[in-house]
Swiss-Prot record:
Coiled coil: none annotated. Keywords: ATP-binding, Kinase, Nucleotide-binding, Phosphoprotein, Serine/threonine-protein kinase, Transferase. PROSITE patterns: MAPK, PROTEIN_KINASE_ATP, PROTEIN_KINASE_DOM. This is Mitogen-activated protein kinase 14. InterPro entries: Kinase-like_dom_sf, MAP_kinase, MAP_kinase_CS, Prot_kinase_dom, Protein_kinase_ATP_BS. The gene is MPK14. GO terms for cellular component: cytoplasm; nucleus. Residues 388-412, 482-542 are annotated as: Disordered. GO terms for molecular function: ATP binding; MAP kinase activity; protein serine kinase activity; protein serine/threonine kinase activity. ATP binds at I19, G20, K21, G22, S23, Y24, G25, V26, V27, K42. It catalyses: L-seryl-[protein] + ATP = O-phospho-L-seryl-[protein] + ADP + H(+); L-threonyl-[protein] + ATP = O-phospho-L-threonyl-[protein] + ADP + H(+). The lineage of its organism: Eukaryota, Viridiplantae, Streptophyta, Embryophyta, Tracheophyta.
Length: 542
């Protein structure tokens, strides 16, 4: 490693193992030796092979730099490439996450009303920040919501996101929309309305929330027509006024010819849900986008009365046109290479300063760590297919891969068990400068009611022995702890896990996913090898 300078990137990250692989490249878990944090390093291969893919990656790394928020996944670092004009791969360092909401929903039938409330609150809080920056995510779905053992969620995958400017032509702005149909707003099922709004993301959040409540997708359409059919089965036929404002003539004819359907009461569709939650869900799933609340309005709903706090629901500064001027012109691979290199320099302040001052050397004075990483990644890739890790979730496109960890031991595991070992849920805000992870939550003895018989989630609790400031105590008013089902007078085990849903739970693709016990061998206790609960009962951290 004699080619490293004071940047020391190669020495900084200790590569551990491959945790994901796909058409984009490879994901490895690593230890940041400077901070002690677990991270996920994504090697994205041949990013300039297709201009569209390179543009998507540029868009995402730029947005994740600009949108810094606790409910949005964070890029911690991007490694310096060995050559400014010839590099083909990039290495992006993310915070390490334990799972995604798709796996949590599929694996758990014991989520409580407190979980539902806090999950939705985080999603809307993150969405408020995104929308006030004039950004539309456009691809919100459970697989693009990361989750950890503390019930903290983060929005990821901004490859299809767009920044909205007042002079952006609508037709151009939406020509490449390819998001997942099941979470697609009705106005996107056939170019319904002349102007699209952030309400498309609100609809997606409503679909995700409904899926949390029931454990299965709300609108699993097989095609666009079927999607409209099952939407109107629940919501009823749109009003003539709504239909008249639809710009697509075929869509207008189809809806006008549709038999008149009466809406199904949400209390009938979701009989066990909180009435306040149902009223908010009805607003988010309004057929007409103008009837849906903004993220800020939804956060002010009575449903969040006991946890909402405007002080921790920040807005973003609108993103300037200059940041995304490349979206408004035809660009070449070399243009994108230069723009991505400029984004990488944001994580190398000294070189960025020289770049901006025009004093940058023609050759690299600060050699890259990429050469060192290539050898490690190549070795791990070679051994990846030998049964040491579980198969990673498949990607739908080539934007930055999700920082999602799959569990591994000496045998393959099914994706249905990825979140089997998420050990506890702690409702807390990531904005806080909390204590060291070794001391926070060191005592998590239940102080409220024990879990109901046969259930795994106890009551909402506070910290046991954590000394916090008055401000932090106000912040930390609500907490959900996952406890195993226990018999009366029995002790609480140190670790607990999300129970599995029915193994025939429907997947996002509409297929039935089953677990083949012949491939997994005899049952044995699941252990979260990546971010385990420690022997004293503390859950894993980011």
């Amino acid at each position: 490693m004699d080619f490293f300078t004071e940047y020391g990137e190669g020495n900084r990250y200790k590569i551990e193992e491959v945790i994901g692989k796909g058409s984009y490249g490879v994901v490895c878990s690593a230890l940041d030796t400077h901070t002690g944090d677990k991270v996920a390093i994504k090697k994205i291969n041949d990013i300039f092979e297709h201009v569209s893919d390179a543009t998507r990656i540029l868009r995402e790394i730029k947005l994740l730099r600009l949108l810094r928020h606790p409910d949005i996944v964070e890029i911690k670092h991007i490694l310096l490439p060995p050559s400014r004009r010839e590099f083909k791969d990039i290495y992006v360092v993310f915070e390490l996450m334990e799972s995604d909401l798709h796996q949590v929903i599929k694996a758990n039938d014991d989520l409580t009303p407190e979980h539902y409330q806090f999950f939705l609150y985080q999603l809307l809080r993150g969405l408020k920040y995104i929308h006030t920056a004039n950004v539309f995510h456009r691809d919100l779905k459970p697989k693009n919501i990361l989750a950890n053992a503390d019930c903290k969620l983060k929005i990821c995958d901004f490859g299809l996101a767009r920044v909205a400017f007042s002079d952006t032509p609508t037709a151009i702005f939406w020509t490449d929309y390819i998001a997942t149909r099941w979470y697609r707003a009705p106005e996107l099922c056939g170019s319904f309305f002349s102007k699209y709004t952030p309400a498309i993301d609100i609809w997606s959040i409503g679909c995700i929330f409904a899926e949390l409540l029931t454990g299965k997708p709300l609108f699993p359409g097989k095609n666009v027509v079927h999607q409209l059919d099952i939407i109107t089965d629940l919501l009823g036929t749109p009003s003539p006024e709504t239909i008249s404002r639809i710009r697509n003539e075929k869509a207008r004819r189809y809806l006008n010819s549709m038999r008149r359907k009466k809406p199904i009461p949400f209390t009938q569709k979701f009989p066990n849900a909180d009435p306040l939650a149902m009223r908010l869900l009805e607003r988010m799933l309004a057929f007409d986008p103008k009837d849906r609340p903004s993220a800020e309005e939804a956060l002010a709903d009575p449903y969040f009365k006991n946890i909402a706090n405007v002080d921790r629901e920040p807005s973003a500064q609108p993103i300037t046109k200059l940041e995304f001027e490349f979206e408004r012109r035809r660009i070449t691979k070399e243009d994108i290479r230069e723009l991505i290199y400029r984004e990488i320099l944001e994580y190398h302040p000294k070189m960025l300063r020289e770049f901006l001052e025009g004093t940058e050397s023609t050759g690299f004075m600060y050699p890259s760590a990429v050469d060192h990483f290539k050898k490690q990644f190549a070795y791990l890739e070679e051994h990846y297919a030998k049964g040491s890790t579980a198969a990673p979730p498949e990607r739908q496109h080539n934007s930055l891969p999700r920082p999602c960890v799959v569990y591994s031991d000496n045998r393959p595991q099914s994706t249905a068990s990825v979140t089997e070992d998420l050990s506890r849920c702690l409702i807390r805000d990531n904005n806080l400068k909390s204590q060291d992870s070794a001391s926070v939550g060191a005592s998590r003895i239940p102080q409220g009611a024990a879990a109901r018989p046969g259930k795994a989630v106890g009551s909402v609790l506070r910290y046991g022995n954590c000394s916090t400031s008055a401000a932090e105590q106000q912040y930390e008013q609500r907490r959900v702890v996952r406890n195993p089902a226990i018999a009366p007078n029995s002790s609480v085990p140190l670790g607990s896990s999300y129970p599995r849903r029915n193994q025939t739970c429907k997947s996002e693709t509409g297929d039935v996913e089953r677990i083949d016990s012949s491939q997994t061998g005899p049952p044995k206790p699941y252990v979260a090898n990546k971010l385990p609960a420690t022997v004293d009962g503390r859950s894993g951290h980011w």
